[in-house]
Amino acid sequence: MRPIISDYIQNDKRFQELDDVFGHQNILVTGLSPSAKATIIAEKYLKDQKQMLLITNNLYQADKLETDILQYIDHSEVYKYPVQDIMTEEFSTQSPQLMSERVRTLTALAHNKKGLFIVPLNGLKKWLTPFELWKDHQITLRVGEDIDVDEFLNKLVNMGYRRESVVSHIGEFSLRGGIIDIYPLIGQPVRIELFDTEVDSIRDFDVETQRSNDNIEEVSITTASDYVITDDVIQHLQSELKTAYEATRPKIDKSVRNDLKETYESFKLFETTFFDHQLLRRLVAFMYEQPSTLIDYFAKDAIIVADEYNRIKETEKTLTTEVDDFIQNLIESGNGFIGQSFMQYDGFESLLKDYPVTYFTLFTSTMPVQLQHIIKFSCKPVQQFYGQYDIMRSEFQRYVHNDYHIVVLVETETKVERIQSMLNEMHIPTVTNVQNDIKSGQVVVTEGSLSEGFELPYMQLVVITERELFKTKQKKQRKRTKTLSNAEKIKSYQDLNVGDYVVHVHHGVGRYLGVETLEVGDVHRDYIKLQYKGTDQLFVPVDQMDQVQKYVASEDKSPKLNKLGGSEWKKTKAKVQQSVEDIADELIALYKEREMSVGYQYGEDTAEQSAFEMDFPYELTPDQAKSIDEIKGDMERERPMDRLLCGDVGYGKTEVAVRAAFKAVMEGKQVAFLVPTTILAQQHYETLIERMQDFPVQIELISRFRSTKEVKETKEGLKSGYVDIVVGTHKLLGKDIHYKDLGLLIVDEEQRFGVRHKERIKTMKTNVDVLTLTATPIPRTLHMSMLGVRDLSVIETPPENRFPVQTYVLEQNSNFIKEALERELSRDGQVFYLYNRVQSIYEKREQLQMLMPDANIAVAHGQMTERDLEETMLSFINGEFDILVTTTIIETGVDVPNANTLIIEEADRFGLSQLYQLRGRVGRSSRIGYAYFLHSANKVLTETAEERLQAIKEFTELGSGFKIAMRDLNIRGAGNLLGKQQHGFIDSVGFDLYSQMLEEAVNEKRGIKEEEPDAPEVEMELNLDAYLPAEYIQNEQAKIEIYKKLRKVETEEQLFDIKDELIDRFNDYPVEVERLLEMVEIKIHALHAGVTLIKDKGKQIEVSLSTKATEQMNGEELFKQTQPLGRAMKLGVKENRMHVTLTKSKQWLDNLKFLVRCLEGSMVIEDEN
């Protein structure tokens, strides 16, 4: 797209006139619409290739301009400095997404990189680390250079990194021997290997496997925070803070002086080795002798652009008042100090006094600066066609007749062809793939996207987007950010920490106390230490660790510890065994019944199906595409489909269901879409109408929102076959509903229907295809255990244009609430205000009404009648209310794309999984969503609430709070899938053992036998110190992980891989580890040779083989191969089993390795044919 418009604009006289003064003098440019303005600014940047600063009044405008600018400039040259419009969010937990964008911007400026930098006003006014100090903390390491290790590690702490034993999250580093691991805020995790003080190698590594990948010659390490805090900064801070405390104390009410003292003491405790960057940022005004602002980071010849000056001044005024009120509030409550602020108060103009500024405004207005030029553009909006082909034809003909240069932007290559053929049918001449030189009177259809089209009459240029043609929304171009798959995120809830509950398959629930090295009979070995009821303790050898699993159950469930040797655990297991067998019977009966029943077999996709799917304006995620293929595969088989489609809220399940519905309708079948609430019915109905508007599909709705007459007509239409798709609540299950030819039943959230309705659904399943949708995740282990008896499709990846919800945790504060509400309403959005006390919910509404007199505020709670509740919700969805004060009834199933702020009072009283689901209510559109979790000021929190809040603080994409929420939701998902009564059984033995028992029961009932190993496990008793010493691997989780891997080794290649991993992660290994690896090597060959026992008997080693291995041994070959051992080896057969005795000598271990290889090499392998 760029060269086409670009070359045309750069050759235009008006642009050249602007270009001569742009960036050299104070000028005013008027008349341009937002996307035309973005185009002109981008062209100027591309021509000059200098640093350009573009200032907007708020983050929302910055995001909008950025989206358009990214159509012209590569995202590697576009930077944004996102600061929330509510500056007081500086006092809450920061979002890593915004932080990494800020750090990326500051880092680029520190390296004097060219780029277009988009900054909202409050980003420009924010106090920052002095430029030289920031620049001094830009680290680039090269292979071969010397470093001072202590100084380097100290610098990492200054830059906001936390030291851990194993690096698993952004902003962490670790030191193990001569290996430093770092996970920077931007870029891949890196492993730096030192030879003394020289950088020997640099490799990137995978935090999941902890293995390194490619060698790199050099690496730049960005800061992990947008502030640099050194020892000197801390000293200066403590001195300034003391002065501020002494100045504040006499000026506040005596009743809050103790609070002030506590606040002061809590900050005074900080020392450089342990401080929280997130917390210290509140004191930025006291940190530096001379703090900088962003303008100090720019080059002297940077071009400065201000967008909509009057809006910027208005925002500045509001900002100053809000920050003053907020700080004053803090001071008066004993939580803040005089002089505490996070922005400078000089006017916006004085910050830019050293630069000429180009001001863009839509209309001419008076400016406070001396302007050298005013350049007026004439720019018109484009006619909104919205699919009205007659108007479209006449307007395009007008452009062609007037010799305009016409550019039509569409978002995908396939759409280029469709729109070209549509215009050709209207006899409008079109071309595609033109690189430059648009001819007048010609329509160029090309790939690209802007927020809106524009017409520049004097240039005779018009740019038209899909938005004007068909009312579609612009797809956001997202910069690539680091995300982990849900599977990766959930994986680490399995990490064992000291104090965690565990389940031993034979002994029951205990508590994990760590890994201990014990000396038994002069030999050192590692054991897993478990605590049981009373003082009972169990030491499990690490080679039996597969009998120990982490105990996972519902949130906040503390299990009872079992007694060692008691019968209680056996009884518990027997009860669960009976339960899983019953479930397995039920599943298999259902499966057999379904396999035997015959339904309608659909044909392959039709041309209409392809056209319908191409009409979808977004790119499918890989999971969506896979699910669609699985569903179509089921429909094209003879047996009826019964598939569960599981995916998080907003991950695109509906589109998958809609495609299945369309496929059914194209073959003359009817579709029933069953949903649990009237609101959802309405929303799905509207989605279907919008999606299928260009196709001959008759869609109807049966719900309380329809009149009796309409419902009657719909029922008749279903009976006659006139209606293709019907959406409705449980009314669809009524006996008075008759279908002419029902082919597909789609059920949304089946677990929310009553028992009677579920029974009715079950009877309908026998001969029609059924697709069930659920937003509660189904655990992967459970998914695996049900393979072959239940068809599951899982959507784990979010759509591309979904932004992570920005999550903040902070104390209750009415000023802050007012700002958050105002900010959302100012962008024409809506707010969910969660207040979970029905008895005082109307009082809360009155309080909010006083804060926001102009807002329309509604209340929704579970004690309202169903009709009132639904009408309130529908009014909110339709935008009649700005704020909805509600209880947790919004937790599931309401889709309000325009509501993108969620405020939850007393968040510490909710469970994590509940908070996770509530948070899913916002950020459903391409706008950024905000979730504020508030807790009462000065409230003493219980320990669990405190842990929960801590987890919520990490509740961003990569945080552990997510993992806990996912764990809890997984268990809820298991209950939904298998029946609520299973919850108790899952809690009694732990989730993993339950899944394992279910899998075994299902396989046994289906007649699938687990493969018997050819040879039993090798028992090894060698008097060797063979273990992983604590000095070599300090982190116990890492140690357990390595033991687990060694236990699974079956080939020498796998063993070599582990040796590489040990050297890669922990450096060269000591003799004890060498011995451990040798024992594993012996075990590999012994297993293949059918050896059952290797025992150290003091002066000799005894090796025993199984009966089967003895039969398969070629004695002649064995004698030949073992000749080098001579008389050190003796061989005999007793009770049909071969026994080999090896006399111990200095090199006995090498001899033993040689012997087991010979035994393996002398086996006669039976011909499998």
UniProtKB/Swiss-Prot annotation:
Q: Which InterPro entries match?
A: CarD-like/TRCF_RID (IPR003711), CarD-like/TRCF_RID_sf (IPR036101), DEAD/DEAH_box_helicase_dom (IPR011545), Helicase_ATP-bd (IPR014001), Helicase_C-like (IPR001650), Mfd (IPR004576), MFD_D3 (IPR048635), P-loop_NTPase (IPR027417)
SMART domains with a match to the protein in the record: CarD_TRCF, DEXDc, HELICc, TRCF
Q: Name one GO molecular function term.
A: hydrolase activity
Which domain of life does this protein belong to?
Bacteria
What subcellular compartments does it reside in? Cytoplasm
Binding-site list for ATP? G647, D648, V649, G650, Y651, G652, K653, T654
- HAMAP family of this UniProt entry? TRCF
- Name listed for the protein in its UniProt record: Transcription-repair-coupling factor
Q: Which gene does this sequence derive from?
A: mfd
